[in-house]
From Swiss-Prot:
The entry's keywords: Aminoacyl-tRNA synthetase, ATP-binding, Cytoplasm, Ligase, Nucleotide-binding, Protein biosynthesis
Protein name, as recorded: Leucine--tRNA ligase
Source taxonomy: Bacteria, Pseudomonadati, Pseudomonadota, Betaproteobacteria, Burkholderiales
Species assigned in the record: Burkholderia multivorans (strain ATCC 17616 / 249)
Short motif ('HIGH' region): ranges: 42-52
GO molecular function: aminoacyl-tRNA deacylase activity; ATP binding; leucine-tRNA ligase activity
């Protein structure tokens, strides 16, 4: 054992042992309870960031603690390897996305291994490998057979210069990110998955999940079950009688309708624009720009009057029709009723264009004004109908019932449940993704690729140039034979949304070598007992993976309907930001490592200068680590300087897993200092610790008893905190233990050895390298086996027993001392001891006690 703690040597030695023993290879074991813990698989972007380090360390701590407690634990890892960033990098570097991706995987895997993570690498998957995405294609074809997958036209962002489809994030201020051309909305054929078929189940099954409440609420809102009325405004056009259908949850305000707005893509808009250049120009404008719902929500609301009116179904009055850029054709009916008196968006629209505003609900104690919107205008819970004829005086529910009944009687509509959730469009006009297994035949139409011909392999040698999909230009990929008629045909060149790849990878981990999509091993491990990932995945990934799991269940592939029993969303890692701003307002951000900060006498930052030139920089505050703010910390630099255990210890100690973590260089140094203390104590006391000296618990002296009592008391709390996933307080407990051991003057070698052995096991899940090596060097491994499989220490309840307890002594409610009494002392004995104590003689001022309050096990208060 070396005198000095050298992290690089310690970690290399421990990892060498683990590799030699294949320590983390896991098999199914019916004799043990299983625990399957999974970190969301990373995108191979090039390097790990501190968010990765935190996520994987949380998982690793969980793995090691549960393995010590007798569980059969599995922690796998893989790579979410398809996606647009690889294409962008390929264009920038002139290399195929495959090379960029595989190089990054190699580097990041090495980083993970240097962290000492308990990953079973025999189960590693990369979603860009044919043996994985074959099953994306296979399940897609099964869904096609069952009608869950289908084809229809969908709206995309089209760059007319690059002749390519753009993702929403590639549209910047309405223009293509590369070409700068005005983006158009275009309708193209796409494949969809019928997730709406599972809407009720997706909503109801949230109740049984051990997921954070805010994640459940986000999914509930995204699924968006709404109870309302679907009805139509009648109109006649070119001799045809039709209904302009809308859906509303506020049928109680129907008498306040003063206009209707329709989407630019609505069939009525197309017909009304014929021969009207100004209408067509506005429709074309609406079709440019992004199609993301978030963009639609924040952009300026614009509209154009069509000059056409529909008829109010209950009053018979004409209602003017407008085309609005805020109306989504993909949501509801592509048309909305405008009630500016009681809808904030409609109110702003009406004020902008001078449309009538009519009040049709009132609330006691509130005054209505047309001048400015007030929140209560849209509050259905306090609303009573006014100016609504026969509905006057009705509250929300009664008014909706009455209006719905009248609309139904007139043949205009009825009550309806609708969903915000839309079917999942999986077609992407991109190269680096799972090929959609469809062949286009001039005679037979769209023909599914036969199962025997799967996978449709994506060529890995193409280099995208930004002008269209490379697959459409690859004759070798494109040209094929129709499996039905044998004629020359073309392959589908769209690839699948990368959320498909991440919707079931956790099931493939359980059977990575299976010749079927999954097998019996999947039902052993799944569902995941713990899933760990960022809150940013709360909706799409987590919702799609739940849907995919239910489809697999319904196809008889698995026996479970939810992918994860429990979810932990770890907090973001934050760091200080520093910048300079030029005359044009452009900010240049500087990494905290390149900045020197000055503090006031209370330790608060008051200024900062750039090390390169000594000139001031602006303190930008604490924000999430990101490339854009240049405030990240490279985990590899941290590991090279301090060791993986220090990085792990700091990330676990600085904050509870679900809370934000503020980066602190001083905190990292403190973590390193603590590990040096643990090592130094072991080295300084190596003879006593390695002595294997035993002891008779009944014959121990006070110093030994006190140390054992403290160690086991803290162990009990640490065990509880491990179970609650509160790893920051586990580290606090270990620090208390070390202080107790270090300060235990007069403790005998046997008790010291026991206490230090408990400390090593408590710390091991958090800092496995240093504890593993100390355990081995000090002879614990010879006695109890390697720390990898050493059992979790059991609390010796007898050691917690005390002959005496200490009570707080108060006089007139103020703490004046402490009182030692027998643990089983009677109330009378406690009162007598309190009155006899020097503190009462000193602070009682010679007065007799009026009353003595005894709180058992805590305090005595003498009132004079």
């Amino acid at each position: 054992m070396h005198e000095r703690y050298v992290p690089a040597d310690v970690e290399a030695a421990a990892q060498g042992d683990w590799r030699a023993a294949d320590a983390y290879k896991t098999q199914e074991d019916a004799q043990k309870p299983k625990f399957y813990c999974v970190s969301m698989l990373p995108y191979p972007s090039g390097k790990l960031h501190m968010g990765h380090v935190r996520n994987y360390t949380i998982n690793d701590v969980m793995y090691r603690y549960l393995r010590m407690n007798g569980y059969n634990v599995l922690m796998p890892m893989g790579w979410d390897a398809f996606g647009m960033p690889a294409e962008n990098a390929a264009m920038a570097n002139g290399v195929p996305p495959a090379k960029w991706t595989y190089d990054n995987i190699d580097y990041m895997k090495g980083q993970m291994q240097s962290m000492g993570l308990a990953i079973d690498w025999s189960r590693e998957i990369a979603t860009c490998k044919p043996d994985y995405y074959k099953w994306n294609q296979w399940l897609f074809l099964k869904m096609l057979e069952k009608g869950i997958a289908y084809k229809k036209t969908g709206t995309v962002n089209w760059d007319p210069v690059d002749q390519t489809v753009l993702a929403n994030e590639q549209v910047i201020d309405g223009r293509g990110w590369r070409s700068g051309a005005l983006v158009e909305k275009r309708e193209i054929p796409m494949y969809y998955l019928r997730i709406t078929q599972y809407a009720d189940e997706l909503l109801n099954d949230l109740d049984g999940l051990g997921w954070p409440e805010r994640v459940k609420i986000m999914q509930q809102n995204w699924i968006g079950k709404s109870f309302g009325v679907n009805f139509g405004f009648p109109y006649e056009l070119d001799g045809e009688k039709q209904l302009l259908r809308v859906f509303t949850t506020r049928a109680d305000t129907i008498m306040g309708v003063t206009f209707c707005a329709i989407a630019a893509e609505h069939p009525l808009a197309t017909r009304l624009a014929q021969g009207k250049p100004e209408l067509q120009a506005f429709i074309d404008e609406c079709k440019r720009g992004g199609v993301a719902e978030a963009d639609m929500a924040t952009m300026e609301k614009k509209g154009v009057a069509t000059g056409f009116s529909v008829t109010h179904p209950l009053t018979g009055e004409p209602v003017e029709v407008w085309i609005g850029n805020y109306v989504l054709m993909s949501y509801g009916e592509g048309a909305v009723m405008g009630v500016p008196g009681h809808d904030e968006r409609d109110f702003a629209f009406a004020k902008k264009y001078g449309l009538p505003i009519k009040q049709v609900i009132a609330a006691e104690g509130h005054t209505y004004s047309l001048d400015a919107w007030q929140e209560w205008y849209g509050d259905k819970d306090i609303a009573v109908c006014i100016n609504s004829g026969k509905y006057d005086g009705l509250g929300y529910a009664a008014a909706v019932d009455a209006v719905a009944a009248d609309l139904k009687a007139g043949g205009f509509g009825d009550k309806q449940v609708t969903w915000r959730l839309r079917d999942w469009g999986i077609s992407r006009q991109r190269y680096w993704g799972t090929p959609i297994p469809i062949i286009h035949c001039p005679s037979c139409g769209d023909v599914p690729v036969p199962e025997k011909d799967l996978p449709v392999v994506l060529p890995e040698d193409l280099v995208p140039d930004g002008s269209g999909n490379p697959l459409a230009k690859s004759e070798a990929f494109l040209n094929c034979t129709c499996p039905k008629c044998g004629a020359a045909a073309k392959r589908e060149t769209d690839t699948m949304d990368t959320f498909v790849d991440s919707s079931w990878y956790f099931s493939r981990y359980t059977a990575p070598d299976a010749e079927t999509m999954v097998d019996a091993r999947t039902d052993y491990w799944m569902p995941m007992d713990q899933y760990i990932g960022g809150i940013e995945h709360a909706i799409l990934h987590l919702l799609y993976s739940r849907f995919w799991t239910k489809v697999m269940r319904d196809l008889g592939l698995v026996k479970f309907g939810e992918p994860a029993k429990n979810l932990l969303t770890q907090g973001m890692v934050l760091n200080e930001t520093y910048y300079r701003e030029d005359a044009a307002g452009k900010k240049t951000w500087y990494n905290p490592a390149d900045v020197t900060v000055t503090h006031d006498d209370k330790g608060r930052p008051v200024g900062a200068t750039l090390n390169a030139d000594g000139q001031p920089v602006v303190l930008g505050g604490i924000e999430k680590m990101s490339k854009s703010k240049n405030n990240g910390v490279d985990p590899q630099v941290l590991i090279d300087q301090y060791g993986a255990d220090t990085a792990r210890l700091f990330t676990m100690f600085a904050a509870p897993p679900e809370q934000q973590l503020e980066w602190s260089g001083a905190g990292v140094e403190g973590a390193s200092r603590f590990l040096r203390r643990v090592w130094s104590f072991g080295y300084a006391n190596r003879e006593a610790l390695a002595s294997r000296a035993g002891f008779d618990a009944a014959a121990l002296g006070d110093a030994d008893k006190a140390l054992r009592r403290e160690i086991y008391s803290v162990l009990k709390q640490a065990d509880f905190d491990y179970q609650r996933l509160q790893y920051n307080t586990v580290v606090s407990a270990a620090m208390k233990m070390l202080n107790a051991i270090d300060g235990a003057k007069g403790a005998t070698p046997g008790v010291l050895r026991e206490a230090y052995g408990v400390l090593l096991r408590v710390l091991y899940p958090v800092v496995p390298h240093v504890t593993y090596e100390l355990w081995k060097a000090l002879g614990y491994a010879d006695e109890f086996g390697p720390l990898l499989d050493a059992p979790w220490p059991k609390v010796d309840e007898a050691a917690l027993e005390q002959a005496e307890i200490e009570l707080v002594l108060q006089v007139n409610g103020k703490v004046r001392g402490a009182l030692k009494v027998a643990k089983d002392a009677s109330r009378e004995a406690i009162e007598a001891a309190a009155l006899a104590d020097d503190a009462f003689a000193k602070f009682g001022e010679g007065k007799p006690a009026k009353k003595i309050v005894v709180v058992p096990g805590r305090l005595v208060n003498i009132v004079v």
